[in-house]
Amino acid sequence: MDLLLLEKSLIAVFVAVILATVISKLRGKKLKLPPGPIPIPIFGNWLQVGDDLNHRNLVDYAKKFGDLFLLRMGQRNLVVVSSPDLTKEVLLTQGVEFGSRTRNVVFDIFTGKGQDMVFTVYGEHWRKMRRIMTVPFFTNKVVQQNREGWEFEAASVVEDVKKNPDSATKGIVLRKRLQLMMYNNMFRIMFDRRFESEDDPLFLRLKALNGERSRLAQSFEYNYGDFIPILRPFLRGYLKICQDVKDRRIALFKKYFVDERKQIASSKPTGSEGLKCAIDHILEAEQKGEINEDNVLYIVENINVAAIETTLWSIEWGIAELVNHPEIQSKLRNELDTVLGPGVQVTEPDLHKLPYLQAVVKETLRLRMAIPLLVPHMNLHDAKLAGYDIPAESKILVNAWWLANNPNSWKKPEEFRPERFFEEESHVEANGNDFRYVPFGVGRRSCPGIILALPILGITIGRMVQNFELLPPPGQSKVDTSEKGGQFSLHILNHSIIVMKPRNC
């Protein structure tokens, strides 16, 4: 059976080569496409550029082909934007035209073919989902309702680290404890739930399934079936694994969190009032018929993917940079002690009084952007950009990392220097008021989680610096900050071992 399938596929490839050659010649006369390497039939530029189109590799192509270039990845168009002006055009000026999301066979499995919010196309469904998610997740009221919980979780990290005898001597992988903190931060918001320890069986299952989902979705293993549709039958085994992981995740979300919350709601007396968690609002929308149960579960899916690990990576990067720059760490600690007083723990209302802490957060997001190419955009229909034709359903990547690290736009961008946000970049904020710096995107499809991420980053980094001297492990002058990823997400290659010496405040 496999030999027959292979024979048919080879014949299809041959026919497709002829068709692609003819079509490309015909289309070439009509379209003015962005510059880029010369594609070959069927494979496009895939064999030339490979799979790993991370933020740094795309900079090399931008230097060769310009701020707007096109890569043909098999049968898919990939358009890369590398300048502030073009970024404004894609994200804001033509935000409707380029406001959709690309999907593929793997993302279709994990999102139920766009039943979520983050990865759905721009249109009525997205507007409805965004509206329903905004009130329970992305308002200042949510911040005020949950800030004490975030502060409690940060304090719990401090307490647990102090109890660990290795933390002040040979060092610990702080990320492990911070991961539990981030899950608790978000599950408090969603379900008014938290996990007691890193060994909690449900936490371990959840973390493992989320990790497997990310690995499968971000893998290059399925590119051949995505780029060349006639080879898609060979992905059956891979897609079966994806479907199994998706089914187990959705079942876990439903049984242990959504259904449990429904039972709690049903046991309350009619008309009783109380502080609602996010899922209560989402379930009310389901009861009104605005969304269905699948939409509810995919909202939970989105939060697990988009809100937890991204903030965790940024915290990890920020702490690593402070370890490697003790003078900046000392300056930040001095601000905290001076403004708040020695031993007075930073809280969310204090953050506006701590400009250097805010600058450290902004500099971390600039140099070590968690999603360096943002979440990809797509134009549903043929479009124009900078005088070039952009064919319908092109994948649009904004190299946001390069916008914030281009030496033509930033002074010594390779340096971790928070002072830049007091000096030459004093006007720049993380909300995208300057298109050289858009860590959360801009416009309709910007990340609404900015309202949660910034205070959590400030509270967590602030408390770690207040309570500990952060040092590299014995025998090392710095921690390794080699990068891993960059096409989807950017994280540290090897999780840092940090020596955390308690301060006597």
Swiss-Prot record:
The chain crosses the membrane at residues 3-23. Heme binds at residue 447. Pathway: Phenylpropanoid metabolism; trans-4-coumarate biosynthesis; trans-4-coumarate from trans-cinnamate: step 1/1. The keyword Transport does not apply. One of its GO terms (cellular component) is endoplasmic reticulum. It is found in: Membrane. GO terms for biological process: developmental process; lignin metabolic process; phenylpropanoid metabolic process; pollen development; ubiquinone biosynthetic process. Gene3D superfamilies: Cytochrome P450 (1.10.630.10). Catalyzes the first oxidative step of the phenylpropanoid pathway in higher plants by transforming trans-cinnamate into p-coumarate. The compounds formed by this pathway are essential components for lignification, pollination, and defense against ultraviolet light, predators and pathogens. Its cofactor is heme. The gene is CYP73A5. GO terms for molecular function: heme binding; identical protein binding; iron ion binding; trans-cinnamate 4-monooxygenase activity. Changing residue 99 to E: In ref3-3; reduces lignin deposition and alters lignin monomer content; dwarf phenotype, male sterility and development of swellings at branch junctions. Its EC number is 1.14.14.91. Keywords: Heme, Iron, Membrane, Metal-binding, Monooxygenase, Oxidoreductase, Transmembrane, Transmembrane helix. It is an enzyme of class 1 (oxidoreductase). It catalyses: (E)-cinnamate + reduced [NADPH--hemoprotein reductase] + O2 = (E)-4-coumarate + oxidized [NADPH--hemoprotein reductase] + H2O + H(+). It is a single-pass membrane protein. SUPFAM superfamilies: Cytochrome P450. Signal peptide: none annotated. This is Trans-cinnamate 4-monooxygenase.
